[in-house]
């Protein structure tokens, strides 16, 4: 269920402050964040955010199509190593 329009998008205050300073200083350095729950705003387009996936920080370059989505959607937390081998079919 989407968030109510009258509430507006959620973004952590510390992340928003880092984004604002990066825009003011025109910095190209990645912004490291643990806030996977924050929504991507139009001001973030073009920035590089390092989103934590539980083990490492995954670099995410924000584009126009990502606006309105959450940061966690672009940093997968699970690694898929394939299904197990069927030993009966191998014979």
Curated annotation (Swiss-Prot):
Domain of life: Bacteria
Keywords: Ribonucleoprotein, Ribosomal protein, RNA-binding, rRNA-binding
Gene3D superfamilies: 30s Ribosomal Protein S19, Chain A
Organism of provenance: Psychrobacter arcticus (strain DSM 17307 / VKM B-2377 / 273-4)
GO MF assignments: rRNA binding; structural constituent of ribosome
Gene Ontology annotations of biological process type: ribosomal small subunit assembly; translation
Keyword Membrane: no
Protein name (Swiss-Prot/TrEMBL): Small ribosomal subunit protein uS19
Function statement: Protein S19 forms a complex with S13 that binds strongly to the 16S ribosomal RNA.
């Amino acid at each position: 269920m989407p968030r109510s329009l009258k509430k507006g998008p959620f973004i952590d205050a510390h992340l928003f402050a880092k984004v604002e300073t990066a825009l003011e200083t025109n910095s190209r350095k990645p912004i490291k964040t643990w806030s996977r729950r924050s929504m991507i705003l139009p001001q973030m387009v073009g920035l590089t955010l390092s989103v934590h996936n539980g083990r490492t920080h995954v670099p995410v370059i924000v584009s126009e199509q990502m606006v309105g989505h959450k940061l966690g959607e672009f940093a997968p937390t699970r690694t898929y190593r394939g299904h197990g081998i069927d030993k009966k079919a191998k014979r």
